[in-house]
Structure formats: structure tokens, C-alpha cells
Amino acid sequence: MEKLIEELRSRVSELEEELHRVRNGEQVHEGHRAKINTMSAEVVDSNPYSRLMALKRMGIVEDYEKIRTFTVAVVGVGGVGSVTAEMLTRCGIGKLLLFDYDKVEMANMNRLFFQPHQAGLSKVEAAEHTLRNINPDVQFEVHNYNITTLDNFQHFMDRISKGGLKEGTPVDLVLSCVDNFEARMAINTACNELVQIWMESGVSENAVSGHIQLIKPGETACFACAPPLVVAANIDEKTLKREGVCAASLPTTMGVVAGMLVQNVLKYLLNFGTVSFYLGYNAMQDFFPTMAMKPNPQCGDKYCRKQQEEFKLKEAARPKQEPIVVKEEEIVHEDNDWGIELVSEVSEEELKAASGPVPELPEGIKVAYTVPITEPTSGFIVEDSEQSLDELMAQMKNL
């Protein structure tokens, strides 16, 4: 106990000294770099952006420094959210808004971000302290509350609509990294009402699968368009939690899902590559399914239905482009003075014999190959002589 008290006193002393230096505008710790006003592509050990700026030199990103103009809100600073915030900070995002009401616990140490000495701190406070040390160029705004309560929900909507890099402007993207459906539905409602593009992410309860999803209100399916069973059945998810039972958590799956999410964010903000509307991950089979989901006209969210109607009007007002008909040019062969002809080595009868029946399929679907009908193998049938192996060997020696 005395040792613990001494450690806590030492920590308090360090924090008091750090607070004193911050108030005096001094550098808090040795080794902390000063802020960088302009990103540079100069390849030197002291440049934290040289590897990122190399993306422009290699033709991947047209203007990487544009990332400093964007604001991203991360809701949920847990296994996925904390790693997502760290990746965006290292990438040099302009501003991060962090929302979470939970505290750091020792049970969180199997994740990739928090450290044991941060136990007891709010997750947003611990995250801001670590992230600010990683990259002082990024602006941070943290909110330690539950967004699903009435008062906090209104404040949450206010911040994502006015908390951009330039105060009074909306954020560029909202990232849902929460672990419960109630919070997801709150984010979904807010973004539908504000017409705010957002990305949803999640990891399964058994920790071996996850997904990310880009949601554009009115254009793609929102979270309420195709809700999980627990939401569609109006089940209180709190009743599903049993005492002494918790969801599994693998740092590997958390890292993979966070990586997919941030990669999609970068492609969306910096306009390179193909942005995925839905990307899944199955760790058991290393399977990455992709798809795009259309909105549900009977969605339970009235703001989603409203945005669907407005999107249809925009599409109808857009000038229609005439389909470009490509005229096939006739192939003109040169004179064949030698009379050379290309003849297939396989006859039509052989091709027909090597192919099997084609099943009836819906329009637009074709089989990659068919399996030929196998015929019984013709040949001699050897009768069973009921002789032992030794007797057969003796007969062979006498031949």
C-alpha cells in the first residue's frame, strides 16, 4: 500500500509540473516537437509527414496536404474508435471530435491503444492526452457524455453541425465506433436529420468478424433501413447482457476493422481509389465481402424517407446522358498469300462431349464452367479368383 501511495504522489507531482509548464507556454516534455505549419515532402528523419507526402509523388493522391482541412467526429473511443483516432492523428487530420462517456479500465488493456496508468481516466481525456503528444498539429475537441440522452443528443447534433475546423461549419465525416445499437440509432437519426454523411463500423460479439459501411442519407441504406434483429424486434438489448458474461475482444480484429475504416475515410476525403459502401471481414476464412445497399422506401426513420424523396428529385432533375454507342469496326485482314488458316484442334463433337448441361439461371448470371456427364468406364472385368497373394505370386514365378 505504501508503494502505491508513493507512486500516486509521484504521478501527481509530474502532472502538477506539466500543468505549470503548459500554463507558462513551455514545452511539456523533452522530445515533443513543435507544430508544423506546412507539410513538407522533404525526406529527412525529422519530418513526420515525408512518408505520407510520398503518396503524391507516387501518383496515389493528388494533394495529400488537403487532409489538414478536414474535420472528423469519432463517436466511441473503444477498441475500434481509439485506434481509428490514432491513425487519423498520425495521418495529420485537421481536427478530431471525440465522443464517449466511458472510463478506461484494466479490462481495456487487451486493445491496442490505452495504457495501464490511464485506468480511471475518461476515455476521451486519456485519448486526447496521448494523441496530442503524437501529433500536436491536430486540433482536438472532446466530449465526455452519453449521446443517447435527450440533452446530450441535442448538443451532439449541434457539434457535428457546427464543430468543423472553421467554427460554425459542419464536420466532414462522422465515424460510428460504438458497441451498442442504441447509440448507432442515435447517430443514424442525427445524420439523417442533418443530411450528414457518416461511416458505421462494428465487430461481432465473438470478435472474429467485423464490417464498415458508408451511409449517405437518401442515397444508400441507413442503419434503420435494414436493422439487426435486436432492433427490428424492439428488444431491450440491456436484457441480453448476463451477469458474468461479456463479449470477446481481439486486438487483431479491432485493428483490422479500424484499418479498413480509416482507409475508406482517406479514400473518401482525398478522392483516390474506390470507396466501399460496405466491406465485411471474416477472420475465420479471411473473407472480405463487399456490397452496396439501396435505401428502404418504408424505412422507420422519417428523415431517411424525406432524404430519399429529395434524392429522387435531384436525380430526376439531373440532365440525362445519352448512352454512347460504340460502333464495331470490321476487321480487315491483309492478303493471305500463303493460304494459311487457323483450325481448332478440337472438333465440335469433342467440345460438346466435354461440356455438361447448363442449369436454368436468373437473367444476367452465367456459369463459369459445366461438368460433363460421366459415362461408365469400359474395360475388362476381372473375376475374383479367391486366391491368396502367395498363390498368385507363385503363379507369376512359373510364367
Swiss-Prot record:
It is found in: Cytoplasm; Nucleus; Endoplasmic reticulum membrane; Golgi apparatus. GO terms for biological process: erythrocyte differentiation; megakaryocyte differentiation; protein K69-linked ufmylation; protein ufmylation; response to endoplasmic reticulum stress; reticulophagy; swimming. GO terms for molecular function: ATP binding; protein homodimerization activity; UFM1 activating enzyme activity; zinc ion binding. The active site is at 246 (glycyl thioester intermediate). Residues 344-374 are annotated as: Linker. Coiled coil: none annotated. InterPro entries: D-isomer_DH_CS1 (IPR029752), ThiF/MoeB/HesA (IPR045886), ThiF_NAD_FAD-bd (IPR000594), Ubiquitin-activating_enz (IPR035985). ATP binds at residues 79, 100, 123, 146, 180. Keywords: ATP-binding, Cytoplasm, Endoplasmic reticulum, Golgi apparatus, Membrane, Metal-binding, Nucleotide-binding, Nucleus, Ubl conjugation pathway, Zinc. Its main location: cytoplasm. Homodimer; homodimerization is required for ufm1 activation. Interacts (via UIS motif) with ufm1; binds ufm1 via a trans-binding mechanism in which ufm1 interacts with distinct sites in both subunits of the uba5 homodimer. Interacts (via C-terminus) with ufc1. E1-like enzyme which specifically catalyzes the first step in ufmylation. Activates ufm1 by first adenylating its C-terminal glycine residue with ATP, and thereafter linking this residue to the side chain of a cysteine residue in E1, yielding a ufm1-E1 thioester and free AMP. Activates ufm1 via a trans-binding mechanism, in which ufm1 interacts with distinct sites in both subunits of the uba5 homodimer. Trans-binding also promotes stabilization of the uba5 homodimer, and enhances ATP-binding. Transfer of ufm1 from uba5 to the E2-like enzyme UFC1 also takes place using a trans mechanism. Belongs to the ubiquitin-activating E1 family. UBA5 subfamily. The UFC1-binding sequence (UFC) motif mediates interaction with UFC1. This is Ubiquitin-like modifier-activating enzyme 5.
